[in-house]
Amino acid sequence: MSEITLPEYQSIAAELKSASLAVTPAELHGLLVGMLSGGLAINDQTWQPILFDYTNEGMGWPSSALGLAQSVFQVTVNELTGTSMELSLLLPDEAGEEGLFALADGVSDFVNHFISGMGLAGIAIYKASDDAKEALTDLEEIAKLGIDEDDDLGEQALLLEQVIEHVKACVLTIHAEFGARPESNENKPTIH
């Protein structure tokens, strides 16, 4: 069985732009991951009206853009509820200096919208464990980061990769505490 992965960043960006939706793929993914990590249901469409309200003044999305969002949602659910402890981030992947700046902006967009998504899901952060609170504090600080064009860009690219891995760890920590899980068959009685 082949593993289903996130759609390509540029194709989603083009579709969102052609649908006149003022959201980037990184923002969309951050919002969905945040809502899921905040406890939003994983097996229904409750995320769609929230997405429409937040990104399009309550208006539904065109079917092609919604199909891509559905694909991103499903891949994200599979990653967050799976056993691999892996999380893919939908970030720009352009080469060169401009690509590095776009990647840094994408990380910031993802993190800011992740935090917004948690709020939209109604997360009660005051009830969070110290680990989850620390993860959220780290994400709030990461959202403020940027690339300094006067410093060594090669070194900053390496640091950005470390930041991305830390973002993933923070997201997984928060999701482990607040995120919805698929119903397990272990608690259901066996029918003979």
Curated annotation (Swiss-Prot):
Q: Pfam families annotated for this entry?
A: UPF0149
One Gene Ontology CC term in the entry: cytosol
**Gene3D superfamilies on file:** YgfB uncharacterised protein family UPF0149, PF03695 (1.20.120.740)
The record's listing under InterPro entries reads: YgfB-like, YgfB-like_sf
Q: HAMAP family, alphabetically?
A: UPF0149
Q: Which family, according to the similarity comment?
A: Belongs to the UPF0149 family.
**What is this protein identified as?**
UPF0149 protein VIBHAR_03551
